[in-house]
Amino acid sequence: IASWPTTIAPGTSSDQTISFCDLLATFADLVGTELPHDAGPDSFSFLPLLCGEDKEIRPSLAVEAGKNHMSFRSGDWKLITGKGSGGFSQRGQPIRTAGPDGQLYNLVEDIREQNNLYDKHPEIVQHLTTMLEKVKETGRTRE
């Protein structure tokens, strides 16, 4: 949620993916400073969104999602590299051990992540896994 009179039109919204870590690049952009290559390796400025541009800010988002799980979002898709919630379930709930080795959700069609498509789209799983491995190897999502 943001308010910036004369810049952000009231009642507007965006479906763009942004992350808390994007604040660093956005603040640098606001003051007219470019981030050094080694600063904020996963930070993208979303200042253009605040100014009304509706262009993609970040190509993907990688997040450590608890207990050895990684979450990777690109476009409409979200890959989770493990079973269950990664430790975010209510206390006392059993950890799921049955089912696919990971989770894949189409967030446009299933924002609540109820329909795991991991076994139905192995090509998307492979593509996102390859992208995530590159992020893990380089230690960054920003070029």
Located regions from the model:
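Short amphipathic alpha-helical coupling segments at ligand-binding clamshell hinges
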Residues: 124-128
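Conserved nucleotide-sugar donor-binding
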Residues: 3-5
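C-terminal cap/loop subdomain of S1 sulfatases and analogous C-terminal strand-loop tails that border
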Residues: 7-12, 16, 21-103, 107, ...
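Residues within well-ordered alpha-helical secondary structure of globular protein domains
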Residues: 29, 52, 120, 130-134
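Intrinsically disordered, low-complexity polar regions and short flexible loop motifs
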Residues: 110
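Charge-dense polyanion-binding interfaces
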Residues: 129-143
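Active-site-proximal N-terminal segment of extracellular/periplasmic enzymes that hydrolyze or transfer
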Residues: 115-123
